[in-house]
Amino acid sequence: PLFETIIDYIPAPEGDPDANTQVLISTIDYNEYVGRIGIGKVDNGCLKVNQEAVVVNHHEPDKQKKVRISKLYEFDGLNKVDVAEAKIGSIVAISGIADIHIGDTICPPKAPEASPFQKISEPTISMNFIVNNSPLAGQEGKFVTSRHIRDRLLRELNTDVSLRVEDTDSPDSFKVSGRGELHLSVLIENMRRESYEFAVSKAEVFYKYDENGKKLEPMELAYIDVPDEFTGAVISKLQQRKGELRNMGSIAGGYTRLEFHIPARGLIGYRGEFMTDTKGNGILNTMFDGYEPYKGEIAYRATGSLIAFESGEAVTYGLFSAQERGTLFIGPGAKVYSGMVIGQCSKAEDIELNVCKKKHLTNTRSSSADEALTLVPPKVLSLEQAIDFIDTDELLEVTPESLRIRKKILDPTLRKRAGFKKN
């Protein structure tokens, strides 16, 4: 039924087979052997192997590059099939053009005319990808050095046009910029599955300054579909994050549609709260909406962290005492080290605890009540929840097997001297 519906309702490709060739590149693939592969639809004319052509972009029409089409592929299911030519309406993959980008148009040299294309939004947030230097570094990952991490990030640039990678003052740290936390979390998860081990910092937004030196920040339009009973909670949370309600209306199925204008930093760490507040039934989509004057400070987290004071293995006796101070992220047997965040404090301060502390053995016979220590099950954070949770003075340690939150400065004395404060 779906295939028949597509045939009945989707219009046939429009274009002139006798006109000059026009192929708009809409996505990029990458192959270790042939390099970048541009994928797009033939809008006009016909594209052939060994044909001379020009690559031109709608937003930079003066920059033109002469190329020769070395390979053409069409798609048969998930496989690429070599073809000699591609006609109107064909979705075609083109290899042999080293510096091809989304939005480029392939056309004949005699009549270079670029197809209109919406400019890709610039990155609005960044995170630092850092070589893991914790006491447990190198035990779980296969690729752990700065060279491994750098090569993997640069390879990602071949297919992800919204990503930016920059060097920093430290050779062990790279500034990675993207369109949002979700964008970067997908990259982090992919690297984790490929056996990379590294640490990431809290997401930060890009600020700009106008000609008068006034601070500007990126803004987002947030479109939200939420069940009617959760509307109040969502509006309240977003207004606390400097969001402005632009529009509100009822839609089918007992849902309300909200439109917010909100700073990009106001959405950092919010998706997890949003899913909790709506019990997983809300839908949140965002779109970049330019730069506007800075809206003021935003309080991200009202609670502190529970920090391990001693390195070793967490035991029931130590965890039983610690769980009274907040919500734990680890259970008995977990490896911990000094400066590692083991839970969320119920107060707005950081507390150091010794979860490796065992009960001292004495000659006094213990009662059964002393032996039956009941632990509350730990809260196991997903990658997105961990990225949302970390504060400005913390890092997320990412390995193929574990996610650990830690302080940037592990030594408690040095940490106090540095004077890190909560936002």
Protein language model features and the residues they cover:
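Structural and coupling elements of P-loop NTPases
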Residues: 1-423
